[in-house]
């Protein structure tokens, strides 16, 4: 079995994206497999888990009743990934058809009933955290909701060095890779949907420059790797940064590759296994409804799909 056959012999969420990104399949064939995501496999399972209150696990960012005793979760402590925000974000990553009846009904329930734990604000109105707001912009664009107000807030929160930081409201003046990639994904989606303004485009470009001038994973001052964990690839991506996530961002933006990503691409190539696959390396800890791969250290259909389409973009555009 070839690597492509291995990916095609999978859940509709992987199959349709592999057909679109790695083959010459017809538009009709791709659309037919994509339509299955809402009715079969992972996508259908997630939709079925929405509660009668219109939320997943009874909450927006966190499940009902969950609290962190020492503040927000970090990269190692984990958090539940079963609430509304991570579930909708996973449905986006699965590429579920936002126009399907099942999805429209689910998103309408979120818009009507889900409110953030912070200040009891409506879900698609955003809240005060830049990472959360960036992801909510991406979700709003994908699922056809009005998120103009969140975009305006994010534009006003961009830091002098070009990025964003969730802790800027507590006085931090230095950008975070994590916050920046989440906001960039939202702004890029907003722009690709035709809603971008001169101001949002300029902000997006400044944010990209923040990553590019650091070669996606290095300190600007010394050239040292910022965090070795970012060299290990995760899926689902959740909120943390890693190099493959950044490469996927630039691929989706569809601009010609900037030479400053060359080192990141070489890292990606170095991780291909002798059988042609890439591994799942850094699963973010926390409760999930069900796994999407076989675990860290095992071949990952998701990371293989993502790596191959990055390399296809990089090789086809450079």
Where are the predicted features?
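Preference for long, amphipathic alpha-helical scaffolds in soluble/luminal domains
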Residues: 1-318
């Amino acid at each position: 079995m070839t690597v492509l056959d291995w990916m095609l012999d999978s859940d509709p969420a992987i199959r349709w994206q592999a057909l679109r990104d790695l083959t010459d399949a017809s538009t009709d064939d791709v659309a037919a497999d994509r339509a299955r995501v809402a009715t079969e496999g992972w996508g259908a399972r997630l939709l079925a888990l929405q509660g009668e209150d219109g939320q997943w696990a009874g909450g927006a960012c966190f499940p009902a009743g969950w609290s962190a005793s020492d503040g927000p979760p970090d990269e190692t402590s984990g958090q539940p990934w079963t609430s509304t925000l991570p579930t909708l974000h996973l449905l986006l990553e699965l590429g579920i058809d936002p126009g399907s009846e099942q999805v429209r009904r689910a998103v309408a329930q979120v818009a009507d009933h889900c409110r953030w734990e912070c200040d009891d604000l409506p879900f698609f109105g955003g809240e005060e955290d830049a990472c959360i707001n960036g992801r909510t912009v991406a979700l709003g664009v994908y699922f056809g909701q009005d998120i103009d107000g969140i975009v305006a807030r994010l534009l006003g929160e961009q830091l002098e060095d070009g990025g964003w930081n969730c802790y800027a409201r507590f006085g931090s003046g230095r950008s975070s890779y994590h916050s920046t990639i989440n906001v960039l994904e939202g702004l890029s989606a907003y722009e690709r949907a035709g809603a971008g303004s001169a101001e949002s485009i300029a902000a997006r470009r400044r944010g990209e420059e923040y990553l590019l001038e650091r070669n996606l994973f290095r300190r600007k001052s010394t050239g040292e790797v910022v965090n070795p964990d970012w060299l290990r690839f995760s899926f689902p991506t959740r909120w943390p940064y890693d190099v493959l996530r950044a490469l996927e961002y630039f691929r989706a933006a569809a601009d010609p590759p900037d030479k400053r990503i060359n080192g990141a691409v070489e890292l990606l190539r170095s991780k291909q296994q002798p059988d042609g696959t890439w591994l799942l390396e850094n699963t973010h800890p926390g409760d999930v409804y069900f796994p999407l791969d076989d675990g860290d250290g095992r071949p990952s259909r998701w990371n293989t799909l993502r790596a191959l389409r990055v390399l296809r973009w990089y090789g086809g555009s450079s």
